[in-house]
Swiss-Prot record:
Involved in the regulation of the intracellular balance of NAD and NADP, and is a key enzyme in the biosynthesis of NADP. Catalyzes specifically the phosphorylation on 2'-hydroxyl of the adenosine moiety of NAD to yield NADP. Its EC number is 2.7.1.23. The keyword Nucleotide-binding applies. Transmembrane segments: none annotated. This is NAD kinase. NAD(+) binds at D81, G82, N155, E156, H166, R183, D185, T196, A197, Y198, S199, L200, S201, Q256. GO terms for molecular function: ATP binding; metal ion binding; NAD binding; NAD+ kinase activity. Keywords: ATP-binding, Cytoplasm, Kinase, NAD, NADP, Nucleotide-binding, Transferase. GO terms for cellular component: cytoplasm. The lineage of its organism: Bacteria, Pseudomonadati, Pseudomonadota, Gammaproteobacteria, Pasteurellales.
Length: 301
């Protein structure tokens, strides 16, 4: 994004949304502090309904997530990566840029350190940022040719049995060409953003955020030859299932939304039309994030 584009975006920051799911008093207090700080800076502030009510804010500051998407030019997510994922899946439909204050564990998507939150937010609101766009995946479940379920994911889509410790048999097609069959606990289909999440735990590769690629990672395959597969990001992936599988299957979207699948269904996966727009401060370095979050060694010399 050019500097002129950054200035143009920054100049639109009139209404700012504050969202999250505080699990303790200290996180709720941070929502309150950020709200009052933004008001002091002259911004119109919308706070997610549940949080605003907990803070006893007036009605004109309360809004649903969809209303924040419709009216805010920036949303601040206070929480961990899970909070970012759940809010971003909705806000990306409105092309709302997001920046996160990390109150979770890893914080791959929430850059701002809570100890320096005000200085870093001030820098962001003054235009000292760049925009990074990341693509989402869309899953469509077809039954006898009709769409019966649909969902988006920022990290990954996971096909798995609804019951624990059951294997399933399925075929995978890439762009209508047969790719492979598999007997396993399931299949992870991950974006570059999700390559450092569940996919990584299953032995998948790390994909840098700007790669136009999708990772297909088997879950406990019943073969020694199965390996993760990286395909072009514009690929259309289809999965169908053996009729003798257990009747209850699911596709999980970011481990937050589950779609039911029957054995005679076909799951179609491709890029979503929506994009996640993350704001990063100028000193953001993806490789530094990997090193600090994953415990990589520092330079030896």
């Amino acid at each position: 994004m050019s500097q002129d584009s950054v200035k143009s975006l920054q100049s639109t920051f009139k209404t700012v949304g504050v969202v999250g799911r505080p699990r303790n008093d200290s996180t709720l207090q941070m929502h309150k502090n950020i709200f009052h700080w933004l008001c002091e800076q002259g911004y119109q502030v919308l706070v997610e309904n549940e949080i605003g009510k907990a803070l006893n804010l007036s009605e004109n500051h309360l809004a649903s997530l969809d209303q924040i998407g419709q009216h805010a030019q920036l949303a601040i997510v206070i929480g961990g990566d899970g909070n970012m994922l759940s809010h971003a899946r909705i806000l990306c439909k409105y092309n709302t840029p997001l920046i996160g204050i990390n109150r979770g564990n890893l914080g791959f998507l929430t850059d701002i350190d809570p100890k320096n939150a005000y200085a870093q937010l001030e820098a962001c609101l003054n235009g000292e940022f760049f925009v990074e766009e990341r693509f989402l995946l869309e899953a469509v479940v077809k039954r006898h040719g009709e769409t019966v379920a649909r969902g988006n994911a920022i990290n990954e889509l996971v096909i798995h049995p609804a019951k624990i410790a059951h294997m399933i048999d399925f075929h995978v097609y890439i762009d209508d060409k047969f790719a492979f069959s598999q007997r396993s606990d399931g299949l992870i289909v991950a974006t570059p953003t999700g390559s450092t999440a569940y996919s990584l735990s299953a032995g998948g590769p790390i994909l840098t955020p700007q790669l136009n690629a999708i990772a297909l990672v088997p879950m406990f395959p019943h073969t020694l030859s199965s390996r993760p597969l990286v395909v072009d990001g514009n690929s259309k992936i289809s999965v169908n299932f053996a009729e003798y599988n257990i009747p209850q299957l699911e596709i999980s979207c970011d481990s937050q939304l589950a779609l039911d699948i029957c054995c005679n269904d076909v799951v179609h996966i491709q890029k979503s039309p929506y994009k996640l727009r993350l704001l990063h401060l100028h000193n953001y370095n993806y490789y530094n994030v990997l090193s600090s979050k994953l415990g990589w060694l520092k330079k030896l010399f």
